[in-house]
Amino acid sequence: QQLTIDIDSFVFQMKAFSGGYTHANSYYTGEIMRNVHSYDITSSYPTVMIAEQYPVTRFCDCATRDLDMLDDQYCWIIDITFTDIYSLFENNYLSLSKSIDRYHALTDNGRVVKADSIRYILTDVDMDVIKKCYRWGGYIINRVQRAEKGYLDKKLIEKILELYNGKTKFKGLADFENEYLHAKQGINSVYGMCVTNLITDGVLYTDSNGWTIEPLTSEAAQE
């Protein structure tokens, strides 16, 4: 109950969520590249879940309107409008589809290269990346919420470690392929469960009408 939020805060916080970064370098899009190399961070999601800190209290609105005042003692969600923003690199972090509003935005396959004005709802993690990848002429903070940060519950961390141990123990062993797949699916689902939106429109199928959508009301969402 201490973490329960109202529907307004829920909608606000959901807009801050975004998926992983997958994007082609615009200089090489459409070309066949040979003799390339790559690497992968093994079990990156579960590693971050046990090593980093997350919101452990309810997010609350605060009056801060200065980016320099967003200290790392808290988790932050920021509704911010940038003006005269531009990317420093060929690979661009900000996604146009996640912006709330924009004016004269130049994009590279959906990623923002520059814009006269663009508005987002971001986390403090996003802001750390954006500060490294972009420069801007000015900004206006429209709304800010903050929560105290801490490590995830010990029981959850222990479960993640248990699943990771099972995954690595069975990996590459032909006689334990099913056990490996089960452990891998389990550890992958931990993150997925944390970011699944449970408050959605209803979907109903009947033989007479086929598929229909039952829009979620604010009252039902709050319940």
Predicted feature locations:
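Conserved acidic
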Residues: 1-223
